[in-house]
Amino acid sequence: MPSFDVSVVTQVKKILEQEAGYLRLRTSEGDIGILPNHAPFVAELSMGKMEIESPNKDRRDIYFLSGGFLEISDNQATVIADEVFPIEKIDVESEQALVENLKKELEKVSTEEEKRKLQKKIKISLAKIDAKNN
């Protein structure tokens, strides 16, 4: 089976390195699917799911990414992620409660910087909920 290497890292550590037959993730331009021998490519990643399918299609690992960058060259896909973790670790009820608390907190803040930080946290939590449910 044709395959390529997928490496996922954050600023802190290497998260995974594995062989894949297919990789799907969300870029700032929309969802993209990567197959073996893909042309060289660089993209900004948006919040959403990242799916890695094994070369023989017997396993599919799904992760949540909060953004980052993708580079493809020489049959190697490198994902540099802001935040990444397995989708099964998302607790929808906890994220929904967090969103409600953050919205209440948002009503009380006075500076634009505080508002932007809270809005980003809300956006990430909503993206986690969407990724888990879809």
Curated annotation (Swiss-Prot):
Any Gene Ontology CC annotation: proton-transporting ATP synthase complex
Membrane topology term: Peripheral membrane protein
Biological process (GO), any one: proton motive force-driven ATP synthesis
Compartment(s) where it occurs, according to its Swiss-Prot or TrEMBL record: Cell inner membrane
Gene Ontology terms for molecular function: ATP binding; proton-transporting ATP synthase activity, rotational mechanism
Pfam families found in the cross-reference section: ATP-synt_DE_N
Membrane spanning residue stretches: none
Keywords: ATP synthesis, Cell inner membrane, Cell membrane, CF(1), Hydrogen ion transport, Ion transport, Membrane, Transport
Claim: Ion transport is one of the keywords in the record: yes
Keyword Nucleus annotated: no
SUPFAM superfamilies in the cross-refs: Epsilon subunit of F1F0-ATP synthase N-terminal domain
Family: Belongs to the ATPase epsilon chain family.
Purpose: Produces ATP from ADP in the presence of a proton gradient across the membrane.
Assembly and oligomerization: F-type ATPases have 2 components, CF(1) - the catalytic core - and CF(0) - the membrane proton channel. CF(1) has five subunits: alpha(3), beta(3), gamma(1), delta(1), epsilon(1). CF(0) has three main subunits: a, b and c.
UniProt-recorded name of the protein: ATP synthase epsilon chain
UniProt organism field: Fusobacterium nucleatum subsp. nucleatum (strain ATCC 25586 / DSM 15643 / BCRC 10681 / CIP 101130 / JCM 8532 / KCTC 2640 / LMG 13131 / VPI 4355)
Gene that encodes it: atpC
